[in-house]
């Protein structure tokens, strides 16, 4: 699943030549909490939230929104073709409510809200972990399924101290749902960190074998 599959396309977007009053009216109309500030080509230049707008004096309502926005350097972003797990990890790490979605050339094309991610994850909770590993396998190149399971056994030993064979690990993930795996790992972030670690170990072991064979 990609970030584009989670994003809200009906988002509030404020242009650099608009005023504070314009921003307030747009957020009210769209019923949104935050919005990106963009240039005429829809490239991100800043960010503003309702809480920040509430702190602005009425005498400043006609001033440019750019005087009150957060600069682009402080804005957490994701790309539309990023894996969905990347945005989940950013929500966990940075404790933000929403994140703008960019194209690779910097245009804002959507927003991902943490509430949307939660709804999507809720639908995924009954999916077997086996399917998530199959998706990982499809994305990490010329690693065989057996090599991925070997890496999973290595990472399990490293992280928990449990000795488990690759075959036993495969049987376990066939019987375990995404929801149960999150609970067993101690949270969503730890689950994805472990998953990423397995992929990295699989690639490292593959590279080591090639070097040894060469």
UniProtKB/Swiss-Prot annotation:
Positions of the CBS domain: 7-65, 69-129
Record keywords: CBS domain, Repeat
Record's keyword annotation contains Secreted: no
Database matches in InterPro entries: CBS_dom, CBS_dom_sf, Diverse_CBS-Domain, UCP006591_CBS
SMART domains hit by this protein: CBS
Endpoints of the signal sequence: none
Membrane-spanning parts: none
PANTHER family for this protein: CBS DOMAIN-CONTAINING PROTEIN, CBS DOMAIN-CONTAINING PROTEIN CBSX3, MITOCHONDRIAL
Protein name: Uncharacterized protein MJ1004
Organism: Methanocaldococcus jannaschii (strain ATCC 43067 / DSM 2661 / JAL-1 / JCM 10045 / NBRC 100440)
């Amino acid at each position: 699943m990609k970030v584009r599959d989670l994003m809200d396309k009906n988002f509030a977007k404020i242009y650099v030549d608009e005023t504070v009053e314009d921003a307030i009216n747009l957020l009210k109309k769209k019923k949104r909490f935050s919005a990106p500030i963009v240039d005429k080509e829809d490239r991100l230049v800043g960010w503003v939230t309702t809480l920040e707008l509430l702190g602005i004096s009425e005498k400043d309502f006609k001033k440019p929104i750019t005087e009150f926005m957060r600069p682009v350097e402080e804005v957490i972003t994701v790309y539309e073709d990023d894996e969905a797990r990347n945005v989940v990890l950013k929500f966990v790490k940075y404790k933000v409510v929403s994140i703008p979605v960019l194209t690779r050339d910097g245009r804002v094309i959507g927003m991902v809200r943490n509430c949307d991610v939660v709804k999507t994850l809720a639908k995924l909770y009954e999916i077997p972990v086996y399917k998530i590993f199959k998706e990982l396998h499809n994305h990490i190149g010329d690693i065989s399924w057996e090599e991925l399971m070997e890496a999973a056994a290595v990472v399990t030993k490293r992280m928990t101290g449990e000795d488990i064979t690759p075959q036993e690990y495969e049987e376990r993930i066939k019987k375990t749902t995404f929801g149960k795996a999150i609970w067993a790992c101690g949270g969503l972030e730890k689950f994805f960190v472990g998953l990423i670690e397995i992929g990295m170990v699989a690639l490292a072991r593959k590279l080591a074998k090639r070097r040894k064979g060469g």
